[in-house]
């Protein structure tokens, strides 16, 4: 009996080893879970559900096979794949969740999220996020020809990489007060998120009691997951 959480795989055709590792995970470890939650940035980029990229079809088929085996799969958007929509969700069998979701896991109230909204010290990113999450702008972008969307996305990724290389690493991590405020607003003692690529289990105080923040690692040279059971919450790194 276990519920699994993953995030930040950044799947793309240029990283076939990560894709292969994820497919093995879906066909193996994930089949034993009560449920699988993907907390954003499953893909390196997402320019629309109508993108015919073969990788997307391959991943959708593998996720659907997991769901059809009896393991429900849930998805929270990340900062890379926030345009992933209902069409892909139907194709893959995933259920889309809001950016903050509270779960009752074996008697624990656990808040799950991607985590980028906690990085409030990075004012430039938060302003950009607010802009690209405007529904009218998303509708306009998705109406553009695929070729143009690809060019825009590539330019934005290059700009993001250049910008991040100039930023202090500290401002790209979560703001501690934002974490406490979010946990107290949701009345939880457990938070699981990704985004920062800094896997760790942090202890803090929220709601006047000890609390825990579990940060998922990115899938680079190895996989990362959080395994929640009735007795334990464990951050696990594993080979592909």
Swiss-Prot record:
EC number: 3.6.1.54
Residues bound to substrate: 79-80, 122, 160, 164, 167, 195
Subcellular location: Cell inner membrane
The record's free-text note on cofactor binding: Binds 2 Mn(2+) ions per subunit in a binuclear metal center.
Taxonomy, superkingdom: Bacteria
Pathway(s) annotated for this protein in UniProt: Glycolipid biosynthesis; lipid IV(A) biosynthesis; lipid IV(A) from (3R)-3-hydroxytetradecanoyl-[acyl-carrier-protein] and UDP-N-acetyl-alpha-D-glucosamine: step 4/6
Gene3D superfamilies: 3.60.21.10
Membrane topology: Peripheral membrane protein
Keyword vocabulary terms for this entry: Cell inner membrane, Cell membrane, Hydrolase, Lipid A biosynthesis, Lipid biosynthesis, Lipid metabolism, Manganese, Membrane, Metal-binding
One MF term in the entry's GO annotations: UDP-2,3-diacylglucosamine hydrolase activity
The protein's required cofactors: Mn(2+)
Main localisation: membrane
Catalytic EC class: hydrolase
NCBIfam families associated with the record: lipid_A_lpxH, PRK05340.1
Function statement: Hydrolyzes the pyrophosphate bond of UDP-2,3-diacylglucosamine to yield 2,3-diacylglucosamine 1-phosphate (lipid X) and UMP by catalyzing the attack of water at the alpha-P atom. Involved in the biosynthesis of lipid A, a phosphorylated glycolipid that anchors the lipopolysaccharide to the outer membrane of the cell.
Family: Belongs to the LpxH family.
Name under which the protein is recorded: UDP-2,3-diacylglucosamine hydrolase
The organism of origin for this protein: Cronobacter sakazakii (strain ATCC BAA-894)
Gene: lpxH
């Amino acid at each position: 009996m276990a519920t699994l959480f993953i995030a930040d795989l950044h799947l793309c055709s240029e990283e076939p080893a990560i894709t292969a590792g994820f497919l093995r995970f879906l066909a193996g470890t994930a089949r034993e879970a009560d449920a699988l939650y993907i907390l954003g940035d499953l893909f390196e980029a997402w320019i629309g559900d109508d993108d015919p990229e073969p990788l997307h079809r391959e991943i959708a088929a593998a996720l659907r096979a997991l769901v059809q085996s009896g393991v429900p799969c849930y998805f929270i958007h990340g900062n890379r794949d926030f345009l992933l929509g209902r069409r892909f969700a139907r194709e893959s069998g995933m259920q889309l969740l809001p950016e903050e979701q509270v779960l009752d896991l074996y008697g624990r109230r656990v808040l799950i999220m991607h985590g980028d909204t906690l990085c409030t010290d990075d004012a430039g990113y938060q302003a950009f996020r607010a802009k690209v999450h405007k529904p009218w702008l998303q509708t306009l972008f998705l109406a553009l020809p695929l070729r143009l969307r690809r060019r825009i996305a590539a330019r934005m990724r290059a700009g993001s990489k250049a910008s991040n290389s100039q930023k202090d690493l500290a401002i790209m991590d979560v703001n501690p007060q934002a974490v406490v405020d979010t946990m107290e607003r949701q009345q939880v003692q457990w938070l699981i998120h990704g985004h920062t690529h800094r896997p760790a289990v942090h202890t803090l105080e929220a709601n006047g009691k000890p609390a825990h923040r579990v940060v998922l690692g990115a899938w680079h040279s190895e996989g990362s997951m959080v395994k929640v059971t009735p007795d334990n919450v464990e951050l696990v790194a594993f080979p592909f």
